[in-house]
Amino acid sequence: MFNSFQQQGTIQPQGTGYYPTQQGQQGQQGQQGQQGQQGQQGQQQQSFQSQPPFNSYVQQPNAGIGGFPQGQSSFGNTSQMTNQPSSGFTSGQYAGGSNANSNLFNQSSQQFGGVGNNNVNVNQSSDPSSLLPQGGSYNNAGLQRPQLQPVQSVQSVHSMHSLGPAQTMSSINPIQSQTGDYYGNALSQQQSRTSLMSTSSQMGGNQLYDTNSQILQPQQQQQQQQQNIQVTAPLQQQSTGLYSSASQPAQAANLQPQQTGFYSQQPLQPQQTGFYAQQSQVPLEPLKPTATGFVNSFANNGINNDIKIPTMRLSFITAQDQAKFETLFRSRVSKGSNTISGDNCRAILMKSGLQPKQLAKIWTLCDTSKAGELLFPEFALAMHLVNEVLQGDSIPYELDIKSKNEVNSFIDAINMSIVSGSTEEPAKQATPFDSLFTNGLSVLQPQATGMIPATSFGVPLQNQMTGGMLNPQATGMMPQTSFGMPMQVTGGPLLSQTTGGALQPQTTGFMPSTSFGMPLQTQITGGAMMPNLQPQTTGSMMPNLQPQTTGSMMPNLQPQTTGSMMPNLQSQTTGSMMPNLQSQMTGSMGVGTTSFGMQPQATGNISLQPNPTGFLPVSNFNPTAPLTAQKTGFGNNEIYSQRNFGSSLGQAEEDSISTEEKSLFYKIFETYDSQKKGLLDSPTAVEIFRKSGLNRSDLEHIWNLCDINNRGQLSKQEFALGMHLVYRKLNGKILPNRLPPSLIPSSNKILDNVKNQLKVASTSNDTKKAPSRTDGLSYKNNDDENILPSFRNRRKNYSTNGTSSSSLDNTPRGSPVTVSGANVSSDTGVTTAVTTSSAPVAPVASAVVKDGRIDMLQKSIREKRGQLEAEISRNRRMLNQSAENRENDMRMIGSLKDKIANVPHILYTKNSSIPDDLNRRIDTIVSRIPVLFSEIADIEFAISNSKIELYKLQNPSSIIGSGPHGEITDEDRKKARSKALLKSRMAALTGKAEEAGNSIEEEEARYNKAVANIRNESRKNRGIIGDIRGSISELSASLMSTLTGGAAGQNTSEFEKWEFGVGLEKEVRTFIETLKSGGILSGSSLSTETNLNDKEDERVQYLKDQAQRKMEQKLAELGINKPAESPSQQSLSSPSQMEAQATPVKSPFQETQHADERSEDSEDEEEKRLREELERIKLKKKADKEKRLAELRRQVQDAQAESDDGFSSSVSGSNNGNVLAPQVEGTVGHVEYPAVPSAANPVSSVSASMSGSSTPVQGTSAAARNPFFKSTDSSNSTSGLSDLKAAEAQRRSQRGLDDDADAWSDDEPSPVAPAPVAPAPVAPAPVAPAPVAPAPVAPAPVAPAPVAPAPAPVAPSPVAPVPVAPSPVAPAPVAPSPVAPVPVAPSPAAPQPSNLPPVPIAPPLPQVQGVPQPVVPLAPPLPQVKQEEQGNFLAPPPSLPHMDNIQNSQNLDSHSDQDDVLSIPDSVASEDELGDEPGLPPSGIPPPPPLP
């Protein structure tokens, strides 16, 4: 489709005169032949491209413009041709009164350039006066409009020409450049030369006008409609010039009628009524004022109107600003692009004068897509932010959600429009008329088509001379609104024309884009003034707009709904100068509720309503918050405040720290003041100031200003002052050389004031008024005074000042006054308490301060004093609490250590396949590894320190590092600077040349670099050592896991942590090493061992016992002995259980072995010697055992005869059983039962159950065994081993008494924690009377009765069986017991003195001796045992030798007193077991047979 706004090439001015006839004819013929083909192509093409509804009315032409049949008058744009007649053809009249359209549809045989004689009144052409100037018409001298022709062969009437002699001319002179109206399709002088289509193309597209149309539609509407207008059939050729021959006037009467209006019911399309635009314009774009200033400077280079920017509003900028930004955006965007590049945007934004840093922040906020280019909404946002900054606002850290959403929505709309535009608007195809744009019309200049203003409708047309050469005419009234183009002179010899006349009413105006679908009313287009034009439907698609009378100067226009589709806006009268317009809601573009609550404004000449003005406050984040009213006028606005007109010096003095700044700086101070001292040391404060990035000189200046007292520390207020000065410098202000009074901390002011007061008080006389120093703070008015509670004044520094100054002055004479600087201490860390007499100051106070103020000051003094005391007490409490907490922590640590030391070790069962010596070696190595690594770490540390010292010696420097690891501290730097300064000054004084050395900084840098290299090397070495330790720990862990069967060493990290001390604190690691070394006994050690360890004199004995226990453990591992259980356990468990418990018995000794081997490496030799001795003892025991067995059998028979002896022997046997239990318990490793009490406990429980008789039983059993019992010797194991002969004699005498001689058990009495065993032997002293027990044993029936009471206290059931079992045993020893035991008793006594622990145990002996008689009632328990034994005693005798052999082979491994336990009580124990399982023979004792 042809675009009338497209640039059509250079159009040269056209002549308006006429050419000779021959030239005109030739031109006509050539033009017709050339343009005919183009016209035909244009018809065919546009008939398919343009509006389909009109195709049914179109008659396709068979020839081009030059070859039309005579019966048709077709125009190049055939798609607009319809069959519907135009009402203008039937009702209009010529000015002269003749009807020119009488033959409108009858003339069908005229040539294209001919005219009918009967169509035009000749008189009209002959009368020159009928030619009037065309002031408002768009045609000058015969400008025609193409009209839609009916399909029938109808000749168009040339409505604009009167008859004249030149009507039959075949050629017309070229037209001069015209400023009249529309040139689109019919310049009469040019019709024979060019087709109407080409003319239309030259002059700006298919623009159609009425001949005398005085209503010009808005230019923007015409621009939009020009893209869709279709050109109708060409007008018939008319001769418009003056005919040169006499025959021409006759031909002039035959002018053909031309259709000048639209012959269609369809609304006319808008046409461009102005001159050709050089560039296409956006449809519906309102006229904008001429761009000036900043925007115009960019827009002068041209505006890119091809950019597709949706018509959307951005709420954060005004509509005017958005229009300006859009113009600026279009002026800088290159063709084919929708974004402005970064360079172009920078060129625009840099002209704002903002700093590049600020512009960079703005760019970051606006470039939402991070593409480096900005779309229009992003550009508008950037310009908005720049304006905000220029007006004093700050750049937001982040865009608010509303603005961000608007920008994103705008960008989405742009993207959618680009996509839809690319699919819906394909590239335009070439048309047959394209060549005419550049070739045929290249000589035509753009023509102004006449913009007739409303004020020119009433101007009458001037008479024109229709003959001869016309003078240049102003062919149109170019108003001020027609783009400022000057009017064109239409020079050239024009023929006389009938330019006025009574033309038929024409459909005038073009249907603008604002009135689609509404038919235009017919208008009178004749030459007379047309005051009453028909109203037309106006407005842009607004169905509610009222039709308006579009004629000239219509005062009473209908009210219209104004605004952009805003239903809430009041209808306004849009006529001329309506004074009283309706009030409208102003504010935002929204409706009703979104108008920011502003008052409705009358948009006419009525006074405006007052509204809140100004910008939203920065702190108000609600974008719709109402604006606050601002003070206006001189004196009320902050701009006119006095401080803005003062000098810069005054402003500097008035500088102060705001409350917000103070709170912020105080928080920073409290963060770094971790010790709550109220002072910040210089390194910390300097480091904080240094983070600001200021240079050193400025920081020094700031420090000198804020460190008022020159103490190298800053109080809270001084720190806040320093931070304020830092920010002041960062903001570009100059630092003062002296602090202004407003910046001096109030604490310093108070102190200075107090000092001055004290000076005055000291120098004043009682009768003379003291000159007191008063400052501004003394007279400062406190608005809160006497209104608010006094606590509000506590936080005001000046009140403290007033307190300290005037309180002195106002106190009654003679009363002591304390001036307290409590608040000062809170900020400065200095507490000032001054007590002085206020007598000399009283006169001054009475002259200055009222009584009420004195009372208030005194009250504030008391409050401050109370606060100070409370603070002091609080600090004291905190100090005491911290000390108590430390003590509590230490106590908890000590208790934890004790608990850890008392916890028993886990019993690990070692792999028996690994040799014992290998286990010892592994334990030794593992215990040695952490020590080695600790030594290696110490050596490595010493090496690194030595390297540093060596570097210092090799490179002496003025700066020496005294910090950790040789680092240089600030103190070292100060010393080095002092030394360098002193050295330079001394050199200057002495006149010596100062040595040119390196600066302190260079020396420090070299030193630090060397130290860093040494540390790095040391770190690498430590890393290598750590890797080695990790590998060793893995090997050790796997090895220990193998040794313990997976019980230990499974977790390598845990093993490394607790065995090697990796990752533990020094104190914890030391404690673990102490545990391992034996300094603190392990949990597996017996309580008796702990008791022995507490006594230094028993340390040696304890170590020997440990050595013997290790030896026995190793023997057990070799399989020589089987561990034996205590009788108490045997009585409750079967032999299978006894075997099962044998294995765990080893583990405690293995554990103790590991702990002891680490600390006692020298015991190996002693162990070897002990082994040899034990082997010899065992051989002797075997031989003696055989002899004793035979002798025992014989003695048993004798014992039966003597009941007394048998009873004593049975009691002794029972006692032996009792003693056996504690020994085994001790050996098994039950830490909870100490050896001594364990021996006594079972008996004591029995005694409790048996009332008083239990004690003698204990004594009896112990007495029977004590003289010969190995346990006594085991406590003195070393002494017993040293005197082997004495020990052997004891055993023999013991076996003579006991019926069960288990000599093989003597090997292992030592492991039975001799300490516990010792008490057991003590009981034996009373055992001597114990023989009485056998008597009750026989009367089994009697025993049951007493047994009943016994059970209650006998809660420990195992204890009861112990005495019961021996009853059978007693018979055997009965015979020897009366004699042997008594003398034997002294033998154990000898060993007792050697052992310290047994000695205290002796006391029970006398008790037992005194109680022997009551022992008899203890017999009752024996019957119980007897009942259990009755069925079992028969079998034992034969099995005795066999049992002995078995016991010999098994008991070598026992950890308890294998000798004593198995020799005497073993028989009892075996009988106890027999009670549970009769299958086993008791102990081979012969007594059983005699019992039944």
Swiss-Prot record:
- Membrane topology according to the record: Peripheral membrane protein
Sorted alphabetically, the keyword list is: Actin-binding, Cell membrane, Coiled coil, Cytoplasm, Cytoskeleton, Endocytosis, Endosome, Membrane, Repeat
Basic and acidic residues: bias regions: 1167-1196, 1285-1298
Q: Which GO terms describe its cellular component?
A: actin cortical patch; actin cytoskeleton-regulatory complex; endosome membrane; nucleus; plasma membrane
The region called Disordered is annotated at 1-175, 240-259, 761-828, 1120-1225, 1237-1492
Q: Which SMART domains match?
A: EFh, EH
Q: Where is the composition biased (Low complexity)?
A: 1-54, 105-126, 146-163, 244-259, 1126-1137, 1206-1219, 1237-1257, 1271-1284
For bias type Pro residues, the affected ranges are: 1311-1406, 1414-1423, 1479-1492
Q: Which GO terms describe its biological process?
A: actin cortical patch assembly; axial cellular bud site selection; bipolar cellular bud site selection; cell wall organization; endocytosis; endosomal transport; positive regulation of Arp2/3 complex-mediated actin nucleation; reticulophagy
Where in the chain are disulfide-linked cysteines found? none
Where is composition skewed (Polar residues) in this entry? 70-104, 127-142, 165-175, 798-823
- Subcellular location as annotated: Cell membrane; Endosome membrane; Cytoplasm, Cytoskeleton, Actin patch
Under PANTHER family, the record lists: ACTIN CYTOSKELETON-REGULATORY COMPLEX PROTEIN PAN1, EH DOMAIN
**Family, per entry:** Belongs to the PAN1 family.
Query: What's its job?
Result: Component of the PAN1 actin cytoskeleton-regulatory complex required for the internalization of endosomes during actin-coupled endocytosis. The complex links the site of endocytosis to the cell membrane-associated actin cytoskeleton. Mediates uptake of external molecules and vacuolar degradation of plasma membrane proteins. Plays a role in the proper organization of the cell membrane-associated actin cytoskeleton and promotes its destabilization.
Q: Supply the name of the protein.
A: Actin cytoskeleton-regulatory complex protein PAN1
